[in-house]
Regions:
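N-terminal FAD cofactor-binding segment of flavoenzymes
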Residues: 17-79, 373-384
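Feature captures the FAD/FMN-dependent oxidoreductase FAD-binding
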Residues: 69-143
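Internal hydrophobic alpha-helix adjacent to the cofactor/substrate pocket in enzyme cavities
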Residues: 348-369
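A short alpha-helix-loop-beta-strand transition element characteristic
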Residues: 59-63, 67, 75-88, 148-158, ...
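Predominantly flavin-linked oxidoreductase catalytic cores and closely associated redox partners
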Residues: 109-285, 289-290
């Protein structure tokens, strides 16, 4: 049986792989390289358009739990991430080019996957899994809006990507390698700012000119990828309690904690490119260079890529989708990825995994897995399909949407690890039914 998967991002790539591994013939349709969105830079599958970090690796983090669930269940995205990992303290960060190439090669070489390039403007007949992501083309978005009732089913807001600089252009006499609280290895470049330097930077950042917006009707901002200039305008100290917080960092040149610290994280395996952590932005390119050069260690920084802002499109999933990411009104159509309202790289891959596994089981005449809310995979699918939610917003995985333990555990870290252990025990029991 053939299944059409539309979109070869994280969710679509994961879904196509899982279906193909289960013996289904998959037609993977991807608009790149024929048409490339403003946020994409290559024709590779599973391109990371924002940060190169898949966030926390430990089981005290909900996203760390989600990664471990996927890893144990045979996720191609986690396999690729582990194979292309770069040092990032307690986080799982990857060489973005190596990661995308790994996934692209795996899919193109799979005997059950046929790749068709070109824009899709309407859904084909038969079983379809739609994973066109936050950058769904206008034509397909219009088609989906009509398909889902002709209402405001798709909402628009902005995501933003941080600039990249060459390591050799960073003034390391004004910066140092360390991780916060010396946790893990010293993987971050830390750029200290004294009070006067920070305040001058903050004032210019607040006043800096943003790039012109074309073709968008609103500017709703999701907190997880908020532009640094928007955050700065919320108050003089907002950045110092956010991405520029100095806590846990001591400047070796002064022996004390700086007033503010800008952190840079390795963006490729070679360590030749670093990204400005938390500096997603929609400023004009010239303004980025002018304002960010006020950070002492970046006064002569060479920008490999300036920050950009792009649209995000997602469905009113509680009204439209069930816990298997299927369209309630037309179950032959399944959705996955950020357009369902899951937010983040790992969450997108997780939705693609669950959607594909449950789709395969339905087509095979098997009972659904029904991942429970005690697991991260189940919690996400139950969140996006919760009909009691009225003002639906995109959501990262977090322990708040996973079922509580039902008993007290002293300490937040211990409690979270206990929740993770419970989840992984459930995953191990489900594993024989799922893993191919």
């Amino acid at each position: 049986m053939n299944v059409t998967v539309i979109g070869a991002g994280l969710a679509g790539s994961e879904a196509a792989w899982q279906l193909a591994q289960r013996g289904f013939r998959v037609t993977l349709r991807e608009m790149k390289p024929e048409k490339i969105s403003p946020a994409h830079h290559s024709s590779a599958f599973a391109e990371l358009v924002c940060s190169n970090s898949l966030r926390g690796a430990g089981l005290e983090n909900a996203v760390g739990l989600l990664k471990e669930e996927l890893r144990r269940l045979g996720s191609i995205i986690l396999e690729a991430a582990d194979a292309t990992r770069v040092e990032a303290g307690g986080a799982l960060a990857v060489d973005r080019h190596g990661f995308a190439e790994y996934v692209t090669r795996a899919l193109r070489e799979h005997p059950n996957i046929t790749v068709e390039e070109g824009e899709v403007t309407e859904l084909p007949e038969g079983e379809v899994l739609v994973a066109t992501g936050p950058l769904t083309s206008d034509a397909l978005a219009d088609h989906l809006a009509k398909l889902t009732g002709g209402e405001e089913a798709a909402l628009h807001f902005f995501d933003a990507a941080a600039p990249l600089v060459s390591f050799e252009s960073i003034d390391m006499s004004r910066a140092w390698f360390a991780s916060r609280y010396d946790k893990g290895t010293a993987d971050y470049v830390n750029c200290a700012m004294e009070k006067e330097e920070y305040l001058a930077f903050w004032r210019e950042l607040c006043a800096a000119q943003e790039a012109e917006v074309h073709g968008f009707e609103d500017k709703n901002v999701f907190e997880g990828c908020m532009p640094v200039e928007v955050m700065a305008r919320r108050g003089e100290d907002t950045l110092r309690y956010g991405p520029l917080k100095p806590r846990g960092l001591r400047d070796p040149s002064t022996g004390r904690e700086p007033y503010a610290v800008v952190q840079l994280r390795k963006d490729n395996a070679e360590g030749s490119i670093y990204n400005l952590v938390g500096f997603q932005t929609h400023l004009k390119f010239g303004e980025q260079k002018r304002v960010f050069s006020m950070i002492p260690a970046l006064c002569n920084a060479e920008y490999v890529r300036y920050g950009v802002m792009h649209r995000n499109t997602y469905l009113d999933s509680p009204r439209l989708l069930d816990r298997y990411y299927r369209l309630k009104s037309e179950p032959r159509i399944t959705f996955a990825g950020q357009m369902t309202g899951v937010e983040g790289y790992v969450e997108s891959a997780g939705s693609g995994f669950l959607a594909a596994v449950e789709l395969a089981r339905r087509l095979e005449g098997k009972a659904p897995v029904d991942f429970p809310r005690e697991t991260a995979l189940g919690a996400l699918s139950l969140y996006i399909s919760d009909e009691t939610v009225k003002d639906f917003q995109p959501m990262n995985i977090n322990f708040g949407i996973i079922s509580p333990l039902g008993y007290r555990v002293k300490g937040k870290r211990n409690k979270n690890q206990e929740i993770s252990q419970r989840s992984l025990e459930i995953i191990e029991k489900l594993k024989p039914e799922i893993v191919i």
